[in-house]
Amino acid sequence: MNKPKVVVGLSGGVDSSVAALRLQQQGYPTSGLFMKNWVDFADESECTVAQDREDAQAVTSLLGISFHEANFAMEYWDRVFHYFLEEYRLGRTPNPDILCNREIKFKTFLDHALALGNTLIATGHYARIDQKEGRYRLLKGRDKNKDQSYFLYTLGQKQLSHTLFPLGELEKPQVRRIAIQARLPNHSKKDSTGICFIGERRFKEFLSRYLPAQPGEMRTPDKEWIGQHDGLMYYTLGQRRGLGIGGRKNSNGAPWFVVGKNLPQNTLYVAQGRHHPWLKSLILEANQLHWVAGHPPPLPYSCTAKIRYRQTDQHCTLTAIANGYIKVIFNAPQYAATPGQAIVFYQDDECLGGGTITTTDALGIQS
């Protein structure tokens, strides 16, 4: 029986390259597609798109598979970057990688691939897909340190039915060894850690190109004036670096952390010590909910959740709220739950879905 045609989203990195190699070895008619989703005329010196494209093309040449490319820069700007900027303008901390997966990799790319006559797409994500009781399930990758299901919670039944994750059963060291043994030209390339498709940049400088900074007061929770901040959009809860207030007189020597924001007053709150009570919350609300199965579990529902990537699963209970919101009550206090970030729900290894944090019961959140 002939296997279906699959196109691999090639980034130029090791993971997607090994994904293509494994599919070819498994007998899939495989091709590669390189997506260009960002155009930055003001910063060509830092742009690595040309090198990434060259690496992706070199891999397809070595494997003997066809190479395609597509420019989705307009879709990325309209569906991802505009939202990214708006969230920062409102003082929240968005996660563009999640939106990028939903709107670009598993929507625009998927539609493009199907239009080219392919049946499946594949990526280098560390996650797994299976079928149980007539539906597709999104599962954590075997490599718990690299598991990327947190970034994929917006996928639904259609996307999962057309997607393969060839690295889902592997650990990162195995992937690197496979790349070396196959003599892939990019086998020693380091993993990217920047914003999805934008890359690694000096974030503060980058953001200031698109949003005017609004400096304001920096105070302690006791209202003591500490100094000025450069703009609330540059800071996130729990942040330690880049505050510019180290070595203050009359301080106890402990490092300073961002513990709160008052958006109406444009005030940034800072305090010494990581465990300040303003950073702790037991209850949060979330909206923009998505369920992988297409519907929520029966509420109230006990499960686990992550409020940030690579966090240990936290036990919680989900309860219903009207108008598309959900309340999450944790068994233990959470550190720096941040509006704008994703909360993702799990039952053992299965990713159930998630949403966007809107508010918490932490004292430092004032919007």
Curated annotation (Swiss-Prot):
Instruction: Please list the residues that bind ATP.
Output: 9-16, 35, 124
Q: Where is this site: Interaction with tRNA?
A: 125, 341
| Residue pairs linked by disulfide bridges in the UniProt entry | 100-196
GO:BP terms for this protein? tRNA wobble position uridine thiolation
Localization recorded for this chain is: Cytoplasm
Keywords attached to this entry? ATP-binding, Cytoplasm, Disulfide bond, Nucleotide-binding, RNA-binding, Transferase, tRNA processing, tRNA-binding
Instruction: Read off the InterPro entries from this record.
Output: MnmA-like, MnmA-like_C, MnmA-like_central, MnmA-like_central_sf, Rossmann-like_a/b/a_fold
Give me the reactions it catalyses.
S-sulfanyl-L-cysteinyl-[protein] + uridine(34) in tRNA + AH2 + ATP = 2-thiouridine(34) in tRNA + L-cysteinyl-[protein] + A + AMP + diphosphate + H(+)
Question: The organism sits in which domain of life?
Answer: Bacteria
One cellular component GO annotation, for this chain's record?
cytoplasm
Looking up Pfam families in the UniProt record yields: tRNA_Me_trans, tRNA_Me_trans_C, tRNA_Me_trans_M
- The record places the active site at 100, 196
> Under the GO molecular function aspect, what terms does this record hold?
ATP binding; tRNA binding; tRNA-uridine 2-sulfurtransferase activity
Q: What class of enzyme is it?
A: transferase
What the entry lists under SUPFAM superfamilies is as follows: Adenine nucleotide alpha hydrolases-like
Q: Report the EC number(s), separated by commas if there are several.
A: 2.8.1.13
Q: Kindly indicate whether the keyword Ribosomal protein belongs to this entry.
A: no
UniProt-annotated stretches for the region Interaction with tRNA: 146-148, 308-309
Record has Nucleotide-binding as a keyword: yes
Q: Report the principal subcellular site.
A: cytoplasm
UniProt cross-references to HAMAP family, sorted A to Z: tRNA_thiouridyl_MnmA
Q: What is this protein called?
A: tRNA-specific 2-thiouridylase MnmA
The top of its lineage is: Bacteria, Pseudomonadati, Pseudomonadota, Gammaproteobacteria, Chromatiales
